[in-house]
Amino acid sequence: MHILFVHPNFPAQFGHVADRLSRRAGWRCSFVTEKPAGRVNAIELVQFTRKGGATATTQYCSRTFENAIWNAHAVFEALKARPDLRPDLVVGHSGFGTTAFLRELYDCPIINYFEYFYHTRDSDIDFRPDFPTTELDRLRCRARNAMLLLDLHNCDRGYSPTRFQHSRLPAEYRPKVEVIFDGIDTEFWRPQPGAPRVVAGREISEGMKVVTYATRGMESMRGFDLFMKAAKRITERRSDVIILVAGEDRICYGGDERHTGSKSFKQWVLSQDDYDLSRFAFLGRIPPLELVRLFEISDVHLYLTVPFVLSWSVLNAMACGAVIAASDTAPVREVIEHGRTGLLVDFFDPDALAEAALGVLEEPEQFRHLGENAAEHVREHYRLDPCLDRMVSLFEEVITLDRDADR
């Protein structure tokens, strides 16, 4: 069996799947990516190079689609030059355009991974009135779905990682898309009692309480500004607290720079209030093993997100048994039940977030069961092996489908 995975990045959402299939099932796995060609264990990497893309003169609303078409053609040309690759199945991430032309090259089924379908109302776009979007951004939002719609029509089947993300897809396409999470390696992300109280070279004394926050980028989409307000209140109420922040000073989503005039949302947030930065440790991007230690020594972990793609970090924190206080938003409610696997508060209420955290710090034994339940919940519903088994079952099912050759 030969599966061709397609994604601009590697390993992205497919690297661990390809590794599992090649090592445990003996399937041949190739991976088309912008990364250099070569091999990673048994996975062959095939490089594609985009030769163009959207420019400053490209209409703003069509730039995403323009880039996707360049991706589609680059992948097509790279694979046309490799006639020895004859996959039984193509699996690709929707939206980048990378699988759009492959029906003209291969007579095999295609599965797409659908991460997020954009909406202008009741979504990440309009959730924060304090960071309003422009009319042009709302128009662009609709245009960004063009390649997703093409993939929804073109694919034989698809999958989305969470019920929330699945619910954002157009109703007429949902039946052909399953909900299968990427999977959490609970052998790695697990409670480790007695772990050294050292993170990123910083030793945390036994007497200090630890409040943690982890993010890819410090931005409004992940409520960094509201987290900082809550953290300030926590440090003002307790002198024995250190705030550990893992993540990079960059904006991954949204238009924060347009609102703040600063390329650094973090620095803009710090300029809006008087923070005692001696109480904070900004650790930058830290490797997974350090994140495990961060979650292990955390007395309470804070997580905020607008209605958007759920961060893996919150499930990693849950798997490590962290007690979590998080935003009461749809993607979070799917994984955290208030009072059983964590605490949920209004996204826009930093006082409530601070009070929830202070309650945990004051009576840790009263809330310990939340972390224990969270770890068990991840093991039961999001553990890597069962998730991969479901993916493999989907792949095997689709390979045997009677297909519509005219799609």
Predicted regions span which residues?
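Conserved acidic donor-binding segment of nucleotide-sugar-dependent glycosyltransferases
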Residues: 338-339, 343-350, 359-364
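Nucleotide-activated donor-binding/catalytic signature segment of Leloir-type glycosyltransferases, i.e.
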Residues: 251, 257-285, 289
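N-terminal subdomain of nucleotide-sugar transferases
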Residues: 1-46, 159, 407
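Short hydrophobic beta-strand element within catalytic cores of glycosyltransferases
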Residues: 323-326
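A short, well-ordered alpha-helix in the C-terminal region of glycosyltransferases
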Residues: 352, 359, 366-381, 387-393, ...
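Acceptor-binding helix/loop patch of EC 2.4 sugar-transfer enzymes
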Residues: 52-61, 108-146, 187, 191-192, ...
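Conserved donor-binding/catalytic core segment of Leloir-type glycosyltransferases
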Residues: 200-222, 228-233, 243-244
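Aromatic "clamp/platform" in nucleotide-sugar-dependent glycosyltransferases that forms part
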Residues: 306
